[in-house]
C-alpha cells in the first residue's frame, strides 16, 4: 500500500480496503525505521493520528472530503504550522511555534490530509544539497537502493558504502526524501531557484513549481518574495495535479495571487495527443559542465516527442549566461531585507547580551544564523548600499526583465513547452558535495532552474531513467505562465512513455534494517 500512488491509495480508502488510521500507522512506522535518512525535523505523530481518526469517521459516515482525505503528507519546515514547531532548520527559530497555518497547509488540512511532520532543509532554504541545516544533512534514499548498491559492487574503487551516501539536492531535500522513502504520498517544498525541482531530480520524483501567483505564499517564511513559490513533490504527475487542485486559487492574505477563479480540479487526460505540440530546446542550456548521460537522455527525450509527430525546434534564450549572476544579486538583496525581521525582539532566538540594543541585535544574529545565511545577508546589503544600488540591484532588475522576455519570445514563436535538463548530473556523494562551498554549489545546481523563477513560469522535473551508477536523472519541462494544466498534461504523457523504475519498498526496508544494525554495532563498539 505504501508503494502506491496517492490516487490509488485514495481509491483504496474510499473502497474500504484500508482505513486512514491503518495508513497513518504504517507511515509513522516507516518514518521511525528510516530515521537515519534525517528527512524529518519534527514528526507530528499525535496530530496525524487524531486527524486520521477524524478522517475515519467521515469515511464511515459517507462524508469524505475528497481525494486527499486520509492521505499522509509532509510539509517543509519553512511553512508555518499552528501549534507545531517551525524552525527553518535554523538556531534562530528553534522553539518557534506559529499561531497560524500557512494557507497551503490549511488548504491541505481542510481537504482531510494527515500531517505526518515537518521536513528537513538547508537553513532558511539557502542551499542546493540539504546539507547546511542545523539538524544535519539529509540522506538520499537511493543511497540504499538495490539499483545503486549493485552498481557500486561492480566498481572495485568504491569506498565504504555506509559513509559514501548521496545528497538529496535542495533545499527541499527532506520533503523529497520523505516521499521517495514512502513515508508519505506528497510533500510541500518551496521553490525560489529550483529548490523543489532539484531534489526531485536527485530522488526520482516529480517536482512541480507552479506559476508565480497561482498558489498562496502566505505563511511561507520568505526567502525571496518575488520568486518564492510553494512546490509539490509526488511520485507521479497525476498526484501533483491532485495536490495542485487543492492548493491553487486566490488568497486575500497574499496580494500576489491571481484574483480570477481557477478552474479546478486540475484533471489530466488519460491519453494525450502530443503530435500538434511544438517542443523548444534552448541551445544555451547545452553547457560544458552537463554530464554526457544527462545530455544523451535530453536528446532521446526530444527524439521521443519527434517520433510521436511533435515539432521539436532549437530556440534561443540569449540572456541565459547572465541569469545566475542576476539571480545572485536579486536573491541576496531580498534575503538581506527579509532576514532583518529576525532581531531578537519579536520571536525566535535572543542572546543574553543586554549592553545595548545594537549589541543584542548583532549577537542574536551571529548566534542564530549560520555562515551561509550571514554571507548572503552581507552580499545583499552590499548590493543595496546607496553607492551600489543603481549599478547592481537596479541593473539586475533590468536583466531580469530581459530574461523573462526571452521566454515570452520563445513561446510567442510557437513553442508550447520547453524541454531542458533539471540538473547537471545525478546526485553526488555527500563527501564530494561538501568539497565546494554553498555559493559555488548553488550556482552550479541552479543553472537550469533559477531563470524560471525570475520569469514566474511553471516548471516540472520528471524522472527519466537511471544513470550508469543506478541513480535517478530528471528532465525539466517549462510552460507558459498559468498554463500549468497543459504543462502537467505533457509531463504526464512523457512520464508514461519513459516508465521510470521506482525504488522497491522491500529493497529499501532491507537496507534500512542493515543500516540500523550497523549503527547499533557502531554504538556498542564506541561504548567499549
From Swiss-Prot:
One of its GO terms (biological process) is regulation of protein stability. It is found in: Mitochondrion. GO terms for molecular function: ATP binding; glutaminyl-tRNA synthase (glutamine-hydrolyzing) activity. Disulfide bonds: none annotated. Pfam families: Amidase (PF01425). The keyword Ion transport does not apply. Residues 148-167 are annotated as: Disordered. Keywords: ATP-binding, Disease variant, Ligase, Mitochondrion, Nucleotide-binding, Primary mitochondrial disease, Protein biosynthesis. It comes from the Eukaryota. Its main location: mitochondrion. Gene3D superfamilies: Amidase signature (AS) domain. It catalyses: L-glutamyl-tRNA(Gln) + L-glutamine + ATP + H2O = L-glutaminyl-tRNA(Gln) + L-glutamate + ADP + phosphate + H(+). Its EC number is 6.3.5.7. It is an enzyme of class 6 (ligase). Changing residue 427 to L: In COXPD40; uncertain significance; requires 2 nucleotide substitutions. The active site is at 76 (charge relay system), 171 (charge relay system), 195 (acyl-ester intermediate). GO terms for cellular component: glutamyl-tRNA(Gln) amidotransferase complex; mitochondrion. The keyword ATP-binding applies. Belongs to the amidase family. GatA subfamily. Allows the formation of correctly charged Gln-tRNA(Gln) through the transamidation of misacylated Glu-tRNA(Gln) in the mitochondria. The reaction takes place in the presence of glutamine and ATP through an activated gamma-phospho-Glu-tRNA(Gln). Subunit of the heterotrimeric GatCAB amidotransferase (AdT) complex, composed of A (QRSL1), B (GATB) and C (GATC) subunits. It is linked to Combined oxidative phosphorylation deficiency 40: An autosomal recessive mitochondrial disorder characterized by prenatal or infantile onset, fetal hydrops, severe hypertrophic cardiomyopathy, poor growth, sensorineural hearing loss, hepatic dysfunction, lactic acidosis, and decreased activities of mitochondrial respiratory complexes I, III, IV, and V. The disorder is lethal, with death occurring in infancy. PANTHER family: GLUTAMYL-TRNA(GLN) AMIDOTRANSFERASE SUBUNIT A, MITOCHONDRIAL, TRANSAMIDASE. This is Glutamyl-tRNA(Gln) amidotransferase subunit A, mitochondrial. It comes from Homo sapiens (Human). The gene is QRSL1.
Amino acid at each position: 500500500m505504501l508503494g502506491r500512488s496517492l490516487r490509488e491509495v485514495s481509491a483504496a480508502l474510499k473502497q474500504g480496503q484500508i482505513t486512514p488510521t491503518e495508513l497513518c500507522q504504517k507511515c509513522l512506522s516507516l518514518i521511525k525505521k528510516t530515521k537515519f535518512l534525517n528527512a524529518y525535523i519534527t514528526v507530528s505523530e499525535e496530530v496525524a493520528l487524531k486527524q486520521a481518526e477524524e478522517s475515519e469517521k467521515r469515511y464511515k459516515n459517507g462524508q469524505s472530503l475528497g481525494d486527499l482525505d486520509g492521505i499522509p503528507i509532509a510539509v517543509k519546515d519553512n511553512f508555518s504550522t499552528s501549534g507545531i514547531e517551525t524552525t527553518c532548520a535554523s538556531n534562530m527559530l528553534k522553539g518557534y511555534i506559529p499561531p497560524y497555518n500557512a494557507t497551503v497547509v490549511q488548504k491541505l488540512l481542510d481537504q482531510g490530509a494527515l500531517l505526518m511532520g515537518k521536513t528537513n532543509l538547508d537553513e532558511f532554504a539557502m542551499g542546493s544539497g540539504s546539507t547546511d541545516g542545523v539538524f544535519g544533512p539529509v540522506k538520499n534514499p537511493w543511497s540504499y537502493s538495490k539499483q545503486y548498491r549493485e552498481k557500486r559492487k561492480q566498481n572495485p574503487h568504491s569506498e565504504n558504502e555506509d559513509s559514501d551516501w548521496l545528497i538529496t539536492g535542495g533545499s527541499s531535500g527532506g520533503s523529497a526524501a520523505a516521499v521517495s522513502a514512502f513515508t508519505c504520498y506528497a510533500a510541500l517544498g518551496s521553490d525560489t531557484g529550483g529548490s523543489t525541482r532539484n531534489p526531485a531530480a536527485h530522488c526520482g520524483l516529480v517536482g512541480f513549481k507552479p506559476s508565480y501567483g497561482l498558489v498562496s505564499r502566505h505563511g511561507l517564511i520568505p526567502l525571496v518574495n518575488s520568486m518564492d513559490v510553494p512546490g509539490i513533490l509526488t511520485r507521479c504527475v497525476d498526484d501533483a495535479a491532485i495536490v495542485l487542485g487543492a492548493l491553487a486559487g486566490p488568497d486575500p492574505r497574499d496580494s500576489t495571487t491571481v484574483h480570477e477563479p481557477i478552474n479546478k480540479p486540475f484533471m489530466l487526460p488519460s491519453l494525450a495527443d502530443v503530435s500538434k505540440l511544438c517542443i523548444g530546446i534552448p541551445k544555451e542550456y547545452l553547457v560544458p559542465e552537463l554530464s554526457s548521460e544527462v545530455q544523451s537522455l535530453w536528446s532521446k527525450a526530444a527524439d521521443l516527442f519527434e517520433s510521436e509527430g511533435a515539432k521539436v525546434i532549437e530556440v534561443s534564450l540569449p540572456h541565459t549566461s547572465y541569469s545566475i549572476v542576476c539571480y545572485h544579486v536579486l536573491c541576496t538583496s531580498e534575503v538581506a531585507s527579509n532576514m532583518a525581521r529576525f532581531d531578537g525582539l519579536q520571536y525566535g532566538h535572543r542572546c543574553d547580551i543586554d549592553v545595548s540594543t545594537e549589541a543584542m541585535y548583532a549577537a542574536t544574529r551571529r548566534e542564530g544564523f549560520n555562515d551561509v545565511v550571514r554571507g548572503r545577508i552581507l552580499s545583499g546589503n552590499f548590493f543595496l548600499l546607496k553607492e551600489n544600488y543603481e549599478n547592481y540591484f537596479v541593473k539586475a532588475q533590468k536583466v531580469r526583465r530581459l530574461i523573462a522576455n526571452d521566454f515570452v519570445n520563445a513561446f510567442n514563436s510557437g513553442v508550447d513547452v520547453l524541454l531542458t535538463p533539471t540538473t547537471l548530473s545525478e546526485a553526488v556523494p555527500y563527501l564530494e558535495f561538501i568539497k565546494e562551498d554553498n555559493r559555488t554549489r548553488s550556482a552550479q545546481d541552479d543553472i537550469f532552474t533559477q531563470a524560471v523563477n525570475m520569469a514566474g513560469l511553471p516548471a516540472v522535473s520528471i524522472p527519466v531513467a537511471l544513470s550508469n551508477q543506478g541513480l535517478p536523472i530528471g528532465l525539466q519541462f517549462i510552460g507558459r505562465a498559468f498554463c500549468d494544466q497543459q504543462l502537467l498534461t505533457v509531463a504526464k504523457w512523457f512520464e508514461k512513455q519513459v516508465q521510470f523504475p521506482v525504488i522497491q519498498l522491500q529493497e529499501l526496508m532491507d537496507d534500512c534494517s542493515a543500516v540500523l544494525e550497523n549503527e547499533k554495532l557502531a554504538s556498542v563498539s564506541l561504548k567499549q
